[in-house]
Amino acid sequence: MSFRDDNTEEGRNDLRRPFLHTGSWYRMGSRQSSMLESSQVIRDSSISVLACVLIVALGPIQFGFTCGYSSPTQAAITKDLGLTVSEYSVFGSLSNVGAMVGAIASGQIAEYVGRKGSLMIAAIPNIIGWLSISFAKDTSFLYMGRLLEGFGVGIISYTVPVYIAEIAPQTMRGALGSVNQLSVTIGIMLAYLLGLFVPWRILAVLGVLPCTLLIPGLFFIPESPRWLAKMGLTDDFETSLQVLRGFETDITVEVNEIKRSVASSSKRSAVRFVDLKRRRYYFPLMVGIGLLALQQLGGINGVLFYSSTIFESAGVTSSNVATFGVGVVQVVATGIATWLVDKAGRRLLLMISSIGMTISLVIVAVAFYLKEFVSPDSNMYNILSMVSVVGVVAMVISCSLGMGPIPWLIMSEILPVNIKGLAGSIATLLNWFVSWLVTMTANMLLAWSSGGTFTLYALVCGFTVVFVSLWVPETKGKTLEEIQALFR
């Protein structure tokens, strides 16, 4: 059966094939040769899917390393290159600018060359960007490297959650989807840890490693079966799905469900911006954009990018060590969320997370406000400093339990297959634009008023509670096709 009869599609698929098959072990596995006994190696579907997720997780690790790099290196880079606070703020935020450009292209790239091909393309500017930073003598190479990193990360941030959602069985999709954000936090923690001991130029060279490992790893995993089905590559689609579910698993029901979904989408004309006004399109897009925007407006990236500055203003002497401690806490909390998301559900974790962030940020804001009226030599000042640090850590924990991993997961789940490229690009672009806005203003807002900055973030998190309770659907335990049917 072919999902598309257009002859031009066959020509396009010929161009895509190098991204699909070159060196892919699943092509050997599909032959089930007695010599290789591939089915014995990957019989357990959970092992097969987990292996794929762990390989693509190198992309989010790169994402996190980019986010975490600017915090431990601020003092050294500004000293070595003679940068002002404003110039370093520009450097810190330029990854977001590059990511916006990458986000615009991400949907179309992932739709044309597939999820694997998209990640291969994203890895190249990341590698070049890190090398540019490591050899920078002035702001030009520094800024160029940060932009290139951002471009690659913008593509990664869309492609990885979509790929994971499309390969994961419904019972594991929440946990596996949360691995995306868990990997981001691991990347951040590694940047914080290595930043304690390694000069900033060497740290930039180490930033090359995730994508350097990702490129060969992609040759050993199958392409997304849903993307293959959409492209009309029927044999490849069924082969990929069989490998992901195990060679002894009956995939007939899932194959037919995906075929029906793709056939239904293929009957519709290409979606344009004007078509997004229909509820089946605008509502999931609104939910996806809303969650991803509120994730950033809550200030988490501002806190992470400039955590050393925040701890210094709180009176912590070893601010970089404290920042690494926050990174460890973030990894642990995100790991807990990964375990809970398919048990407790998405909505409950989002509610707990946003409420916890609101309370934590209010505590931090009050502590900073009160410090203005207390002598720096008093015990009360030290107590308030510790309260503000505890509040920041509590905010990071709360975010990691829900608002960190789940918005990307829900975005990858709720967007209809025929608008996923367009709508996913829009949602990812808005996320990175707001991230840039928060990152660009965080240092200046903290210099203006630490208490005022955290008050603004707290108000946003309070609104997030309302947004989740009114508009975010529960997707736990549903197939992607069942989720999309909710909006019809």
Swiss-Prot record:
It is a multi-pass membrane protein. The chain crosses the membrane at residues 47-67, 90-110, 116-136, 147-167, 179-199, 202-222, 285-305, 321-341, 348-368, 390-410, 426-446, 452-472. InterPro entries: MFS_dom (IPR020846), MFS_ERD6/Tret1-like (IPR044775), MFS_sugar_transport-like (IPR005828), MFS_trans_sf (IPR036259), MFS_Trehalose_Transporter (IPR050549), Sugar/inositol_transpt (IPR003663), Sugar_transporter_CS (IPR005829). Keywords: Membrane, Sugar transport, Transmembrane, Transmembrane helix, Transport. Gene3D superfamilies: MFS general substrate transporter like domains. One of its GO terms (molecular function) is sugar transmembrane transporter activity. The keyword Transmembrane helix applies. GO terms for cellular component: membrane; plant-type vacuole. Its main location: membrane. Coiled coil: none annotated. It is found in: Membrane. NCBIfam families: SP. Sugar transporter. PANTHER family: PTHR48021, SUGAR TRANSPORTER ERD6-LIKE 4. Belongs to the major facilitator superfamily. Sugar transporter (TC 2.A.1.1) family. This is Sugar transporter ERD6-like 4. It comes from Arabidopsis thaliana (Mouse-ear cress).
